[in-house]
Amino acid sequence: MANLKALFLRMKSVKSIQKTTKVMQMISAAKLRQVQQRLNNARMHMLELSKIIDTNVVSKNNECTDRHNKKDILLVIMSSDRGLCGNFNNMIVKFAKSYIEELESCGKNVKLLFFGKVAYNMMCSQYSSKILDVFSNIQSITDFLSFKLFLYGSGVDFNQFIDVMVLFNKFYTTILQKPTVEQLMPCNIDISVSLKEYYKYEPAYLNVLSTMSLSYILNLMYIAFLENCASEHSSRVIAMESANNNTKEMLSKLVLQYNRSRQAAITTDLIEVISGFESLGNQ
């Protein structure tokens, strides 16, 4: 009976875990659809912004920042605030360490800025002297405006770095995401013809270009953030689906074991009852 009770309690525990993983899978799937919609909208906005900048930039390979007297490279590493998303964060950390080693082998000084505390927790002991800050609670970012407010509130001056890179998991499909590095600053914008002479600017041209360049950089980072969020939710959907399948398999084995144990207990009881009747009959 003790064995039956232990099996029953274990089955109850597995059923509870199964419900939890199923709910988490459904929530992540819903969040993934929302992020995909936001990502598509951000890409469309970025396309139109790129057209405007291409029309108004002065020359080819225009650099939006002054690179003099700047030595450090800023690497923005995007991960998640939570686990239970498969190897999503492990891929980011492994790729980040490899990329940092590559930059340092070229004699460059790298500073780190983290979006999401999981990668930070995995790397803080090794790169403590390089870390500027870590931003957690990133799930509170719901649109471009909240992303800008979140970024402005950080107090990080991106203009103090010679290069700014963002490292994130790029979303391709639900089952395919790859760690990627993209350059944010300086923003090199290539065009074939300068059309500045065909337009009048109010305020001054450089002010307009500076504002558009800042918007361009923020949009690049926002798209990287959304790509990373989509990859996170996709990884969590797959991880929870796998966990749910594992609980189903475990539960079926436990049910089979429970039924066998119960049948054995019933058989034992019947044998004892029959043996008792037989002993009484013999008397």
Curated annotation (Swiss-Prot):
GO molecular function, one term: proton-transporting ATP synthase activity, rotational mechanism
Membrane topology annotation: Peripheral membrane protein
SUPFAM superfamilies, alphabetized: ATP synthase (F1-ATPase), gamma subunit
Residue ranges of the TM segments: none
InterPro entries xrefs: ATP_synth_F1_ATPase_gsu, ATP_synth_F1_gsu
Keywords: ATP synthesis, Cell inner membrane, Cell membrane, CF(1), Hydrogen ion transport, Ion transport, Membrane, Transport
Protein location: Cell inner membrane
CDD domains, per the entry: F1-ATPase_gamma (cd12151)
Gene3D superfamilies: 3.40.1380.10, ATP synthase, gamma subunit, helix hairpin domain
GO annotation, biological process: proton motive force-driven plasma membrane ATP synthesis
UniProt KW Endoplasmic reticulum keyword: no
Chief place of localization: membrane
Cellular component, GO, one term: plasma membrane
Family: Belongs to the ATPase gamma chain family.
Complexes and interactors: F-type ATPases have 2 components, CF(1) - the catalytic core - and CF(0) - the membrane proton channel. CF(1) has five subunits: alpha(3), beta(3), gamma(1), delta(1), epsilon(1). CF(0) has three main subunits: a, b and c.
Function recorded in the entry: Produces ATP from ADP in the presence of a proton gradient across the membrane. The gamma chain is believed to be important in regulating ATPase activity and the flow of protons through the CF(0) complex.
Name of the protein this chain belongs to: ATP synthase gamma chain
Organism: Ehrlichia ruminantium (strain Gardel)
